A protein has these predicted regions:
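FIC/Doc superfamily catalytic core
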Residues: 1-177
Length: 177
């Protein structure tokens, strides 16, 4: 029996809401593989220290929070010039693995911006912020071709439009080819 709000109840009204647990070994492997793979797309490579900690997490020896604490301590004790951006790769990898391990998500521009903030806080000053200036960038994945990005003044509206279009698009019947 439970007393809830001054009312005597026979069952727990929150019993069906379970606290999310860490994922199983297979899913942890997927999350880490994805996290490290996404870093490779930007030409970044994580440290062996992170890879070892990720394996310990996959094996169930340590939690994601413990991986983060170990990593934070590692970089506090061993500051680097970081010309190869290994620290960034390590910190963003653990953050990606953590986000992929959460079962909370909403397909909205705010969630998108929140993910950017979670990934890049402490790495970039603009983490979780919509830029207020126009940019271009040469992309190595496009053999150095320059990409012109959307106008800064319209980014919020463009983002909302793109999300709305994507929500209403049907992938039913499309092949993987």
């Amino acid at each position: 029996f439970i007393i809830f709000g001054g009312v005597f109840m026979q069952t727990d009204p929150f019993k069906e809401y379970l606290k999310q647990q860490e994922p199983d070994k297979k899913y942890k492997g997927y999350a880490w593989q994805t996290a490290i793979g996404l870093q490779a797309v930007d030409g970044l490579k994580p440290s062996e220290y992170l890879v070892d900690a990720a394996i310990q997490n996959i094996e169930g020896k340590i939690t994601l929070d413990e991986v983060k604490k170990l990593l934070d301590s590692y970089y506090e004790e061993k500051p680097q010039k970081n010309h190869d951006r290994t620290e960034e790769a390590d910190k963003v990898s653990i953050r990606i693995a953590k986000i992929l391990s959460e079962h909370a998500f909403s397909f909205t521009p705010n969630e998108y911006i929140s993910i950017h903030r979670k990934l890049f806080t402490g790495i970039y000053d603009h983490a979780g912020k919509i830029r207020d200036y126009n940019i271009t960038k040469k992309e190595w994945v496009l053999n150095g071709a320059t990409v012109i990005y959307g106008s800064a003044s319209e980014l919020r509206k463009t983002l909302e439009y793109d999300f709305m279009k994507e929500k209403h698009y049907s992938y039913k019947g499309l092949s993987m080819d």
